[in-house]
C-alpha cells in the first residue's frame, strides 16, 4: 500500500518550537510526520532551518506568515521561506485595520498583489487562510472573492 505523506502545522506546537526548535522538529519526525508547515522561525536563519529540515528529513511544505511581517520586508521574508524550500506561503489572518470594510483593506489588496508577484518569482504560491470576516459583500462582491482574484 502506498503511504500518504502527512505534515504537521507547527502552530499546534508553537510553545515547544519556541523552547526547543530543533528538538521539536526531531520529535515531529519521530512521531511519523513527513513534512511541516511553519508558523514562525523563532529567531533562526533560513539556512539554519533548511539544515534542520534536511537533517530530520522533513519536507517544508508551507508557512503561515502574518501579513504585516511579510509586508515589512517582502523580498527577504519570502526569500527566506523559498530558501528553506517552502512551496507555499499563507497570510494566516488579518488584524482589524486590514479587514474588509476598513480603509486598510485596500492595503491588503495591494499588498497581496505584491506578495503574490514576489512569491511567484521565487517559485512559491501565495495562499490566504480565510475566516468569517471575509464573507461580507463589497460593491456586490464577497471580500474573499476580491482577495482570491488578487492572489
Predicted regions, residues:
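Active-site acidic/histidine proton-transfer and metal-coordination neighborhood
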Residues: 35, 67-151
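N-terminal pre-domain/capping segments
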Residues: 1-88
Amino acid at each position: 500500500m502506498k503511504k500518504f505523506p502527512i505534515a504537521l502545522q507547527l502552530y499546534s506546537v508553537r510553545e515547544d518550537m519556541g523552547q526547543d526548535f530543533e528538538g521539536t522538529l526531531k520529535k515531529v519526525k519521530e512521531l511519523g510526520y513527513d513534512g511541516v508547515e511553519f508558523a514562525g522561525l523563532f529567531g533562526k536563519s533560513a539556512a539554519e532551518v533548511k539544515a534542520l529540515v534536511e537533517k530530520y528529513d522533513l519536507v517544508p511544505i508551507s508557512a503561515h506568515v502574518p501579513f504585516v511581517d511579510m509586508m515589512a520586508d517582502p523580498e527577504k521574508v519570502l526569500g527566506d521561506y523559498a530558501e528553506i524550500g517552502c512551496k507555499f506561503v499563507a497570510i494566516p489572518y488579518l488584524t482589524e485595520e486590514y479587514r474588509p470594510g476598513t480603509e486598510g483593506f485596500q492595503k491588503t489588496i495591494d499588498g497581496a498583489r505584491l506578495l503574490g508577484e514576489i512569491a511567484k518569482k521565487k517559485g512559491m504560491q501565495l495562499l490566504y487562510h480565510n475566516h468569517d470576516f471575509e464573507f461580507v459583500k463589497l460593491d456586490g462582491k464577497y471580500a474573499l472573492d476580491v482577495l482570491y482574484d488578487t492572489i
